[in-house]
Design a protein with these regions (language model features):
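Acidic, glycine- and Ser/Thr-rich low-complexity intrinsically disordered tracts
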Residues: 52, 69, 176-187, 380-395, ...
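Extracellular beta-strand/beta-solenoid scaffold signature
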Residues: 84, 110-121, 137-149, 171-194, ...
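Acidic Gly/Asp/Thr-rich repetitive segments characteristic of extracellular carbohydrate-active
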Residues: 34-80, 84
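Right-handed parallel beta-helix/beta-spiral solenoid domain characteristic of secreted/periplasmic
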Residues: 72, 88-140, 165-179, 488-493
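Bacterial N-terminal signal peptides
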Residues: 10-22
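Bacterial N-terminal signal peptides that target proteins for export
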Residues: 1-13
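Aromatic, loop-rich ligand-recognition surfaces of beta-strand-rich domains
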Residues: 428-432, 437-488, 492-550
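Right-handed parallel beta-helix
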Residues: 94, 101-103, 126-137, 152-169, ...
């Protein structure tokens, strides 16, 4: 065959292969180092070698990327810049933003959370996996925005990230004019019933000292004209910690399908006053969610905020299932089932299974009612199945603000108990051992070894006056998985403190002291019980919840 025809055939075959997808560009890995990088290099190597080597700035790294590409930030380095990568990945080949090297997480520190500064910004993009990055003093750590009419994006994975120190709080009714410090915000300009972003995972992340942790939002922040409009889908949280924040750490609006599993929300609202209430979490206009093995505790109304509940279904939430969750130590109710505050649609299909509510309702402000549950209308459809209610003196089970003939609350195989009667049976015999401080803690660990498998539903703690424990975690040993599992996150102990937990079966328990206000740590009692659950509580649909205040 003549050379001309051989060349022509090769070119034709190459073109055909491109058209058929036979060739794909090889994924590239880019390196960025504030300490050793140079923007004149190609970014394709971790160490400098001729023209190869890491970039220096996130501005330089804000280029077009292809599916499967990686952007790696050097551990131990710090940037006061925004990373705005271009392009999208796919669920199968996401664009990875992560780290390389040794040391602490790479840090994006914007230095002033009162300025509208972001750590990573996405614009109508999907297919990103963000792993192992720290965000500090950003008004928003990760901000992703989606335009009206934009095509649906898929896949956003955020794992092992640390969001901290953004306590700006202003009246944010006109958001996205940003006036509030957030860890992550997904914002949709779409007003139609259309999904703009789906398949989102937030895993093993810490949100600390933020006005609010994670938001989904739209231009009408309170969504009064957006009934049953869902712009986000399949949003999942797993093994995350939210603590020392101001307002609701999960502010979730307009999301169909999602989950919260093995998450802890702790110490919310102190030293702060909100214009529209405080809660551990607030969900509005959401559907088809599952919450499992999670905890919301120590929610404070601070300097005069309203509400103060552990959890708030704000309205228009349908088919929401909560299993094995603990709601405790709140200034307001343990649980708020709200309506009217937003669009007026009641919550439907709320199911609570094997949950513990030990609210205490220490200082309710708005409304001035002490109850484990505040339900704004009998039209709320909620089923409480095998739940346990601990009532402090004068605290009721449920208060309904607007009474209706159609009462849709049901209590089945539940129990109600005075908190003062807790830990009244014989404690489990156990050997308590004090051990040195564990990683990440400033105090010792106290271990209870029962020598056999026991069932536990309550702990009693006592502390010497010379001690000042201010943060601790109680964990039980999972024999099947051979690992420790959190069952209660606490603050002060004082003379005596009762920790009611979701029932556990275990052979060991431990208390890890995380923080102490004083030099000494002296725990005089760490006792475990399988106490009687209290009085049966059964209310059929249409019935009235008994007036049974705690004693």
């Amino acid at each position: 065959m003549p050379r001309f025809f051989r060349a022509t055939c090769k070119i034709s075959l190459f073109a055909a292969a491109l058209l058929c997808g036979g060739f794909t560009a090889k994924a590239a890995t880019y390196y960025v180092s504030q300490s050793t990088g140079d923007d004149s290099l190609d970014g394709l190597a971790a160490a400098k070698a001729g023209a190869k080597g890491p970039w220096k700035t996130l501005t330089k790294a804000s280029i077009q990327y292809k599916p499967g590409d990686s952007i790696l930030l050097k551990k131990g380095d710090t940037w006061n810049e925004e990373l705005t990568p271009k392009g999208s990945g796919t669920p199968e080949k996401p664009i990875l933003i992560s780290s390389y090297g040794q040391g602490n997480k790479p840090l994006i520190d914007r230095e002033d959370f009162k300025q509208d500064r972001t750590g990573i910004r996405l614009d109508n993009q999907g297919g990103y996996k963000i792993v192992g990055i720290e965000f500090a003093r950003c008004m928003t750590g990760i901000y992703a925005e989606y335009a009206k009419g934009a095509p649906t994006q898929k896949y956003l994975w955020i794992e092992d990230c640390y969001f901290r120190d953004s306590l700006l709080y202003g009246r944010y009714e006109d958001y996205p004019k940003r006036k509030i410090g957030l860890g992550v915000c997904l914002f949709s300009w779409e007003t139609d019933k259309k999904i703009v972003m789906q398949d989102i995972m937030v895993k093993n992340c810490v949100f600390r000292r933020l006005a609010s942790g994670f938001w989904t939002n739209s231009p009408d922040n309170f969504n009064k004209n957006a009934s049953f409009v869902y712009n986000f889908a399949n949003l999942n949280f797993e093994n995350c910690l939210f603590e020392e924040g101001y307002q609701w750490q999960l502010g979730i609006r307009g999301v169909i399908k999602g989950s919260v599993k093995n998450c802890v929300t702790h110490d919310i609202g102190r030293g702060f006053r909100s214009f529209n209430g405080v809660a551990g979490a607030m969900f509005f206009r959401c559907k088809d969610w599952i919450f499992e093995d999670s905890e919301w505790g120590f929610v404070d109304i601070g300097l005069g905020s309203g509400d103060g509940e552990a959890f708030d279904f704000e309205g228009n939430c349908d088919n929401m299932i909560m299993r094995n969750c603990n709601f405790h130590d709140t200034d307001g109710p343990g649980f708020l089932l709200c309506c009217y505050a937003s669009d007026g649609h009641p919550n439907m299909g709320i199911v609570m299974e094997n949950c513990v509510i030990n609210a205490k309702s220490k200082r309710p402000l708005q409304p001035r009612v002490r109850a484990a549950i505040i339900n704004t209308t009998d039209w709320t459809e909620a089923t409480w199945n095998k739940c346990r209610f601990y009532l402090s003196k004068g605290e009721g089970i449920m208060t309904v603000m607007d009474r209706e003939k159609d009462k849709r609350s049901t209590f089945k195989d539940c129990f109600v108990k005075n908190l003062s009667a807790a830990c009244s049976s014989p404690k489990h015999p156990a050997q308590m051992t004090e051990m040195a401080a564990a990683a990440g803690a400033t105090g010792p660990t106290f271990l209870l070894d029962f020598g056999r498998t026991v069932s536990i539903n309550e702990f009693k703690l006592k502390e010497d006056p010379a001690s000042g424990i201010s943060r601790y975690i109680i964990e039980t040993w999972d024999d099947k998985k051979s690992q420790w599992k959190s069952c209660f996150n606490g603050m002060g102990i004082g003379g005596e403190f009762v920790c009611a937990i979701v029932p556990q079966t275990t052979s060991k328990a431990r208390l890890r002291v995380i923080a102490n206000r004083k030099e000494k740590t002296v725990l005089t009692a760490f006792d475990a019980y399988n106490d009687p659950p209290g009085d049966p509580l059964n209310v059929a649909r249409g019935g009235d919840t008994p007036n049974r205040p705690g004693k």
